[in-house]
Structures are given as structure tokens and as C-alpha cells.
């Protein structure tokens, strides 16, 4: 049977946050737009609807499960505030059912949005036939040949499995954990990325024994002092860590558990049995199986797409989101994989293509948060990178430990939460990095990101009167510098 054919002004390959934003914005400018999106099942068979990683297996479910863990912590604290609380019991199935129900409502909403914006949606896997044409195949095998004047590739990425026996047969990834129909039980999380630590945090937080196996450092690419604080807090709250280790095999046991063998840096070996083995060792971009060579688009050695203002080496083909090679940007950036970045880049690209606008995506000074049990919010440079770029003599770091008021009655730890500003001395102590570990770190960081984006200096922070008692006010009170050697520990709540 001959393939159906269709012609569009813009074809978007990938229905994640960036692709959807770009397609709807282009349609609002009167263009004929189509989106192709198709989810190949994970090795355990998990699949999902329209919306990409963030909605289905990323930001949304992980934040909801992080909240589940925080609620459990809050119930423990409640007695200190006078509440008589029976021993709380968590129901994994209820949580997963409600989370998946919410995700499905979002999937439906995205499909409705495309329809109401006049965007044609193909639930089909697209591969290039030539620079202007793709072949889209749906789950029933129906083939549609689609041509477009411009094409945007935003196919995202998928979790990587280690190349060891039993990994794909017996392990899961973040593609699967949010839809697990039964509790994870004793869980081994392999990796120390933000995905690894976030998953380990909420699994432990809702009541399951959790171990993290890490090869080297936690939260690579983030400020390492802050990463250490996140890790220490997790250890103090019951998450075990196997450090300097790499898994070598996963085997099924007669009891139904998974036996994981590993090798340590000193050459010694070890093993343990777990009910769930979750791999979070990184992600691979989805560019290898879309016929991108037939489009003439060049790839970096890591499979990502080098771009200039989202444009590839083929003038009418663009890329946004995870697949952009952030290291090839000028300056390099690690923010290309963030959902809000993809959304912003997609909208701005559509405006440049079809509305005569000129605004470009700025990948610098983008705020982010790691939803570990002790949340970590950041905007700007890690301390190590600031020193590397500008020299230690040109950097001033203001810092302080603090204890949220809410932690006082339950007698939570002192000098656990921490805030620091990284300032560039030759530019009037312009703030080039802000980092905080503490409750609601994301909510706090978002507001400060606006100020830092606008060029705020340490003097601006000092001149701002804080809201008392809040966690955020710590940034208006910072006085001790690392250079001075003065103590950053706090003994009271009034500066």
C-alpha cells in the first residue's frame, strides 16, 4: 500500500516540552505545523503518552514522589507541634496510581492543546528520507510520508544501561520507577547523578531500604561542596552508599531477588541482594535511529547535535532540548537538558522563523534545583568553575550555615542547611553564582535568579531587607567570607 503524503511549513520531531512549545508558537503565527511523537517501550516494557520525559518520567512524577517523602517527614515532625499522629504508613500503589492518573490527564491536555492550536499530531516514529522528508510509521504499521520547509528535531534522550550481564533483563531506570505497580522493596540505585540521588531520596523517604552505588563523585557538574552536603544529609537519614564501585553483573536468585556483583577501585569485589535495581548512570540522546545522516545533519562524537542559535549545519533543520551539544555552545552550557530551557528555546525559535523577531536563547544563568531530601538550588557558576574561569584572587565567596525556624521544635540538626554567594570582585562583586541547600530551595532560587540575571551585586543583596523569619533572608545577611576564615556557623536567628 502506498504511503500517505502530507506537506507542512514546519515539522517537529519529538513531542516533549520543547517540541510542543515550538509547534504551538509556530501555529500561532499562522503556519501549517505537524508533530511526530512515538515512545519506544523501555526494556521492562514501560511506555507513556504525549509530553516527553518531564511530564511522564521526569520532573512531574519525581517532584510528586519527593513531596510524598516530605509529607512523611512532616508527619514525624508534627508531634513537636502538638499533633497526635498515629504511626504513618505509606501505600506505594496508591501513590503510583494517583501520580499516573495525573500524568494521563496531562497527556490528554497536550493532545487537546495541539488540536485547538491547529497542529497535526502523528503518534508515529519519524525517520529522515532526505533533508526535507521523513517517513512516519505508527504502531499499526501505517506509513505517512511528510515533507516540510523547516524541521525541528527534539527527540530527547533515554536512560543508559551499563553493558553488563543481566542489566536490561533485571534492572529498571527512571523510565520505569514512577509506574512500578508494586513497592520497590530493598533498592539499589546505581549512579550518583541528580536522577540517581533524587530517586534514592524519595524511595528511602517513603520507607524502603535504599543503597546508592557510585563510581566517583556525586552530582557531577554541580558545585561539589553543595553536592557533598546533599550526600551527607542522605547518609545521615539512612541512605547507604557504596563508593568507588562499578557493577559487574546482575543475576536472578531463587527467592526472586536480584544479586548484584560489583568491583571496587582497589580491585576487591563485593555483592548484595536487592528487590529492585535502578540504573541512573546517564542518558543517551535519541539521534542514532532517526536517519539523521540522510538529512545531512552532523553529530558530535557523543551523538548530540552541534548548533548555532538552535540551527544545525543544514540551514532549514534545527534542534532544541536534550539533543543539543551544550559543550559546543559559545560559551559551553550544561543547561540544554532542562525542560524550561527547551520550552524557551522552542518559542524563541518559532518567533524568529515566523514572526520576524530576533531574540536568542540565553543558556547562561539558568536556575535549577535538585530534589534530594535536602533540596539544592543553584543559579550561575559552581565555585570550582568560577575559580577556574576567573582565578581565585578575583572571587569572593560569602557563606553561612543556617537552621530553618521550622526545624527548631523537632530538634533537627544544626548547621545542616547552607547558603553561599559567589561574587566577581573586579566587577563590583557581581554575583555569578548562588547556591543553597535547604527546604524549598527551588522556590527560593527562582526569585534570586531574576536578580542575578539582571546583574545584581553583593551590595544589592546587602541593601535588601529580608523577610523574617524565612530561609531566603539568609542571602541578605551573608557576612562571612571563605577567604577571611571566619566561622560560617549560626548561633541565633537575628543575624
Curated annotation (Swiss-Prot):
Q: Which GO terms describe its biological process?
A: cell redox homeostasis; cellular response to oxidative stress; glutathione metabolic process
UniProt keyword terms in alphabetical order: Disulfide bond, FAD, Flavoprotein, NADP, Oxidoreductase, Redox-active center, Selenium, Selenocysteine
- Report the catalytic activity: [thioredoxin]-dithiol + NADP(+) = [thioredoxin]-disulfide + NADPH + H(+)
GO MF, one annotated term: flavin adenine dinucleotide binding
A Pfam family found in this protein is Pyr_redox_dim
According to the UniProt record, what class of enzyme is this? oxidoreductase
Q: How is its activity regulated?
A: Activity was very low in selenium-depleted cells, but increased 4-fold to the same level as in selenium-sufficient cells for 70 hours after the addition of 10 nm selenite.
User: What are the annotated disulfide bridges?
Assistant: 54-59
The record lists FAD as bound by: 37-54
Q: Which EC number(s) does the record attach to this protein?
A: 1.8.1.9
Q: Give the free-text PTM comment from the record.
A: The N-terminus is blocked.
Covalent link Cysteinyl-selenocysteine (Cys-Sec), residues: 493-494
Per its UniProt record, the required cofactor names are: FAD
What positions does UniProt annotate as the active site of this protein? 468
Q: Which GO terms describe its cellular component?
A: cytosol; mitochondrion
Give the superkingdom in one word.
Eukaryota
Query: How many and how are cofactors bound here?
Result: Binds 1 FAD per subunit.
Q: Which family does it belong to?
A: Belongs to the class-I pyridine nucleotide-disulfide oxidoreductase family.
PANTHER family found in the cross-reference section:
GLUTATHIONE REDUCTASE, THIOREDOXIN-DISULFIDE REDUCTASE
What does the record note on quaternary structure? Homodimer.
Miscellaneous notes: The thioredoxin reductase active site is a redox-active disulfide bond. The selenocysteine residue is also essential for catalytic activity.
Identification of the protein by name: Thioredoxin reductase SEP1
